UniProtKB/Swiss-Prot annotation:
Belongs to the DEAD box helicase family. It catalyses: ATP + H2O = ADP + phosphate + H(+). This is ATP-dependent RNA helicase HrpB. Its EC number is 3.6.4.13. The gene is hrpB. Pfam families: CON_HrpB, DEAD, Helicase_C, HrpB_C. NCBIfam families: DEAH_box_HrpB, PRK11664.1. It comes from Escherichia coli (strain K12). The keyword GTP-binding does not apply. ATP binds at residues 27-34.
């Protein structure tokens, strides 16, 4: 094994790891970086603690762990183990854990210091999956703030060194030349007049006739794999096995595809891009590359993912071709013109730029980061995708302002997709928990093709679903409980309320509660039902309507009875074009779907406004335009009543405001004739109208919205209902302030969140004088080294404040 190419750079790599917290390793496929190097690092005395090896794909993780254990003459679970969703194989003596991406994130969240871990290896980092980017950001944060002794090795076959070196300029780069046999690369564009499946099958069969050895065929997705397999079956001899390989196959079926062909047989492995890098497939010397891939692109406008078939990057073509030269000289046939291949993008677009970021945002909030820009990213998450993620988390009740709510914290602790996590934590008893766990297991690994009825899938006892649901129940700390199909609809409705659907035609078309269209095959048995919940949707490429992949038929009356919180009641006035008059209607709605309509007598202006006020009372104050300024004014009034009770402050709790809408809101509703118009109202001014001029002055004086710090900066005070008021300010701007600022006639000290020059929290205190005299010394010592260009005086209480560095002070 020491003849492996990566062995030649082992001394250089070990020296780099001894000297630097992060090291970059570029080593082509087959160099031994996954299946040999980790054991050498395990034996290195400079690595103190366990090694965590991240593999992006489950099959690769298990295979790598199996191979590493074999080299030690052991089984997985001894020195080498693995962890992945629904499968753990580790023991008390395990020192090297091979894990998949989500598992690593959970490990970091549960133990931010990664206690007992000396080295984390990110393998196949060039794939730039969303979870790998998140893991890198979290690990760099851990190194910076908690574990400066933790080592990080980032390795890949086609490492984007330029980008990584810009982000990690001090990280040594170790390059292994690798070892591969020459691969003859041929190009053959597919005939325009021939069906894709037929043309690929013909080209593959011809390659098998001309050349010896087994063949790896790259296709965009499962549909193409199944169709090309069918076409190939009639074009090849009995000595050729056809083996599909894609992510949704069971691990056992995937393993069959990578094992050697039986004696005297050849095989064709029909694979998606799962086979590009991390898997060793025995006996391959021929590659046929269709030069296409299917990628998921998230649409933040609809909240849905669209599958796009596109040309692969040049890096992917190189990787695919390289599979033919792992064991002997090989041939790679790219089904594309050479000129087109040369015009392809150099690298694939990272997932973080085109994915649903709701899970990432929830992970960051659990980490304590409300602003993703504070983390280190190779590519910043798109703002529009983050806003869509925030909207979803708000809908699921996971947010409280800019932080996770109590429910959001429970959701984040599970590590599931946010919708599934919301469903799981909503379970009120063991039976509901068992039902939610089984639904989550099905939606995580849905049945491929076939029946779209979730109820039918729920009735099946598929082992993988059973195993996964048991794992989820363990996380929920639930023992016992029976999965009950009658509980599916209300559980789904809580997490997928926007995907409740009502039929709008006889051809399988539906409207969703969020206003979007969706479609079932007209021959699907579910399409006969008026109401569905469709948790699994895919944005169509040829139609604006989403495609329903999995749905549950619903008795809407029963659902409304069991989940009254889903229904909004609104009184509206509409023109009746036929009569030329106004008519009033009371609608019971779920989102944009009307459940029931009842006519009302023609209202007067006063009746219209009263109906609107009733609508506000039914829906709650959230239908109003609560700007941050209005929210803070309300909190100031709530706090004033507690801190200065001797004055007659108006009550502004929900119940009181709803009861007094006629007093404070109605005077501002002139000309407002719709619920939409309510959104244009200035709630800040409406609330200030509750105070006379004298009380307004008292509020602004005693509980000001801003505090002027010694530098003259006016900084917003953050008021909270149950916590002291807080002021986040850079420490240098508070120099010269000897005592802690107070408000409310000196009764309430401000909580000072003293920030570093980079706006990171350094200290939280309610006693500034005590801090200057005590804990400041430790902060000063650390910050002088980290921010030498900034002022860190010995006597901050008597030093002039500044916003600037020493150069300008």
């Amino acid at each position: 094994m020491s003849s492996l190419p990566v062995a030649a750079v082992l001394p250089e790599l070990l020296t780099a790891l001894d000297c630097a917290p992060q090291v970059l390793l570029s080593a082509p496929t087959g160099a031994g970086k996954s299946t040999w190097l980790p054991l050498q690092l395990l034996a290195h005395p400079g690595i103190n603690g366990k090694i965590i090896l991240l593999e992006p794909r489950r099959l690769a993780a298990r295979n790598v762990a199996q191979r590493l254990a074999e080299l030690l003459n052991e089984k997985p679970g001894d020195t080498v183990g693995y962890r992945m969703r629904a499968q753990n194989c580790v023991g008390p003596n395990t020192r090297l854990e091979v894990v998949t991406e989500g598992v690593l994130t959970r490990m970091i969240q549960r133990d931010p210091e990664l206690s007992g871990v000396g080295l984390v290896i990110l393998d196949e980092f060039h794939e730039r999956s969303l979870q790998a980017d998140l893991a890198l950001a979290l690990l760099l944060d851990v190194q910076q703030g908690l574990r400066d002794d933790l080592k990080l090795l980032i390795m890949s076959a086609t490492l984007d060194n330029d980008r990584l070196q810009q982000m990690l300029p001090e990280a040594p780069v170790v390059i292994s030349e690798g070892r591969s046999f020459p691969v003859e690369r041929r190009y053959l564009p597919l005939p325009a007049h021939q069906r894709f499946d037929d043309a690929v099958a013909v080209a593959t069969a011809e390659m098998l006739r001309q050349e010896s050895g087994s063949l790896l065929l790259f296709l965009p997705g499962v549909g193409e794999i199944q169709r090309v397999q069918e076409q190939l079956a009639s074009r090849i001899g009995s000595d050729v096995l056809l083996c599909p390989l894609y992510g949704a196959l069971s691990l056992n079926d995937q393993r069959k595809a990578i094992l050697p062909a039986p004696q005297g047989m050849r095989k064709v492995v029909l694979a998606t891009n799962i086979a590009e890098t991390s898997l060793t497939i025995e006996g391959i010397r021929l590659v046929v590359d269709c030069a296409q891939e299917r990628v998921a692109r998230f649409d933040p406008r609809t909240g849905l993912t669209r599958l796009i078939t596109q040309r692969v990057s040049q890096a992917s073509m190189t990787q695919r071709a390289g599979r033919a030269g792992r064991l002997e000289p090989g041939i790679s046939l790219h089904l594309i013109a050479k000129e087109q291949a040369e015009r392809a993008a150099a690298q694939s677009e990272p997932e973080i730029l085109q994915s649903d970021l709701s899970g990432l945002l929830m992970e960051l909030l659990q980490w304590g980061c409300s602003d993703p820009a504070q983390m280190s990213w190779l590519d910043q998450p798109p703002v529009v995708n983050l806003l869509a993620a925030k909207r979803l988390l708000q809908m699921l009740g996971a947010l409280e302002g800019e932080r996770l709510s109590a429910q959001g914290q429970k959701m984040a602790a599970l590590g599931n997709d946010p919708r599934l996590a919301a469903m799981l934590v909503s379970a009120k008893n063991d039976d509901e928990a068992a039902t939610a766990a089984k639904i989550a297991a099905i939606l995580e690994e849905p049945p491929r093709m076939g029946n779209s009825d979730l109820g039918v899938a729920f009735s099946r006892n598929q082992p993988a679903w059973q195993q996964r649901s048991q794992q989820l129940l363990k996380r929920l700390n639930v023992r016992g409980g029976e999965a009950d199909s009658s509980l599916i609809a209300p559980l789904l409705a809580g997490a997928f309320a926007d995907r409740i659907a009502r039929r709008r035609g006889q051809d399988g078309r539906y409207q969703l509660a969020n206003g979007m269209g969706a479609m079932l095959d007209a021959n699907d048995a579910l399409s006969r039902h008026e109401w569905l919940i469709a948790p699994l949707l895919l944005q169509g490429s040829a139609s604006p309507d989403a495609r329903i992949l999995l749905a549950l038929l619903v008795d809407i009356d029963e659902l409304v009875q069991r989940c009254p919180q889903l229904v909004q009641q609104s009184d509206t006035v509409e023109w009746d074009d036929a009569q030329g008059t106004l008519k009033a209607w009371r609608r019971l709605q779920i989102g944009q779907l009307t459940v029931k309509v009842q006519p009302l007598a023609k209202p007067s202006e006063d009746e219209l406004h009263q109906a609107m006020l009733n609508g506000i009372r039914d829906k709650g104050l959230s239908v109003l335009n609560w700007t941050a300024e209005a929210e803070q004014l309300r909190l100031r009034l709530l706090c004033a009543a507690k801190w200065l009770p001797e004055y007659d402050w108006p009550a502004v709790d929900d119940e009181s405001l709803l009861a007094a809408l006629e007093t404070w809101l109605l005077p501002h509703m002139t000309g407002v004739h719709s619920l939409r118009g309510l959104k244009s109202l200035d709630i800040y001014q409406a609330l200030r109208g509750l105070l006379d001029w004298g009380m307004q002055q008292r509020l602004d004086s005693e509980l000001p919205a801003h505090y002027t710090v010694p530098t003259g900066s006016r900084i917003a005070i953050r008021y909270h209902e149950d916590n002291p008021p807080a002021l986040a300010v850079r420490m240098q701007e508070m120099f010269g302030e000897a005592t802690n600022p107070t408000i409310a006639q000196g009764r309430v000290p401000l909580v000072l969140e003293l920030l570093s020059p980079a706006q990171r929290p350094l200290q939280i205190t309610r006693d500034l004088s005590d801090f200057w005299k005590g804990a400041y010394r430790e902060v000063q010592k650390e910050m002088k080294g980290r921010y030498p260009k900034h002022v860190w005086p010995d006597d901050p209480a008597n030093t002039a404040p500044t916003r600037r560095t020493k150069k300008y002070s």
